[in-house]
Amino acid sequence: MLSSHGDNTGRVEAGEIEVVDFYGLPGEATLGDVEQKIRAAIDKERLRAWLQPHPWRVYRDLAFRWGTIGLAMFGAAHWQNWVAYLLAFFVIGFSQYGLFILGHDAIHYTLHLNRKVNDLLARWLIYGPLFMGLDDGRRNHLNHHRWVGTTNDPDRYLHSLADKNSRLKLFFFCTGLATFGKTVLKVSPFGKRQQHKTATEKLAPGNFKGYGLSQPLTEYFSQRISVFVMQILLIVSFLAIGLPWWSYLVLWIAPIYFCVFLPDEVRAFCDHAVDLVPDTAADPYRLVSFTPSWLEATVFSPHNINYHAEHHLFPAVPYYNLNQVHQDLRHNSHITVKRSYVGYLVQLFAKLPLPTVCSSYS
């Protein structure tokens, strides 16, 4: 099982994973087997407490993120110097990332109890401003939850160590350049068509036909009405408070890459990473969470997204209750808890390349 250094807390440092026995489960246990075992041990009263909604927290966090963005814009407009712009870049960028993580709850319908309100908030206050489509994101992410730890996971390229098993490859991945195209493509009409083709070929080889691009294109643009409207409103807002036209590119578009896409790709890797090659040997161990510092949480994991194992186990739990789930499961040795995203990456970088292991799960 995962080494816990005798403290029975399930907390392990990066790079200290041993493949010995697998949690005492029979046969070739999968990640799904582990998840099922953990869920079965949770009583209904505890689960009911975890699921308790507090909608005011959502409104508070949305207001905080947008209020912070507004203050940063006004600050840049008032001082109009490079220090103000640099500060606004990061304040706006990490506020955008906070919004993006709140949107993750909307994907699971846990942002608001009313599903229509849930999607309305997500489309107009989160996904539209960030150039994203809620339905495409939901389709991809729910498939990730369904297939995590298998070759069918649409996000597997993010978690895999097999294609990052050198210092150069890991560094290139951490720039975002290695995965940007794949991440954009999978929620595009072309990616949707390819996923449909792959699924069809698995069920009935040679029978892929009758699914062109017209339907995916129509769905793609209909989802992004909020994108077009919100970008116009944002441009008007930048100009109305006295910011130059290029500030929209520098203070809104650029941070989406550097403060949203890039940290989220790195976080997604770390939150599923296991120091084993090949990936099939690592798959049963992908219940990973982090307990980062406040600064690291701001950069990589706002709104409790660092409790990623807990989220995968109980995706219906709202983000603001995940710390409670973490406290209740902190002694579960099936969950690997790492302390620092940066610390993990540094230790992993020093260990690369990893040798291929022989495992009954590969």
Model-derived regions: residue spans:
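Active-site-flanking alpha-helical
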Residues: A72, I107, L111-H112, D279, ...
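Non-catalytic, topology-defining segments of multipass membrane proteins
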Residues: M1-G93, Y127-V250, Y319-S362
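Histidine-centered catalytic micro-motifs
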Residues: L99-H108, G137-G149, A268-V274, S301-V317
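Cytosolic juxtamembrane regulatory segments of multi-pass membrane proteins
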Residues: G210-G212, Y285-N304
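Transmembrane alpha-helical segments that form the membrane-embedded catalytic/substrate-channel core
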Residues: V91-G103, G133-D135, G181-K186, W252-T280
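Aspartate-rich (DDxxD/NDxxD/DxxxD) Mg2+/diphosphate-binding motifs
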Residues: L102-L121, G149-H159
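Membrane-cytosol interface motif
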Residues: D119, R123-Y127, P278-F290
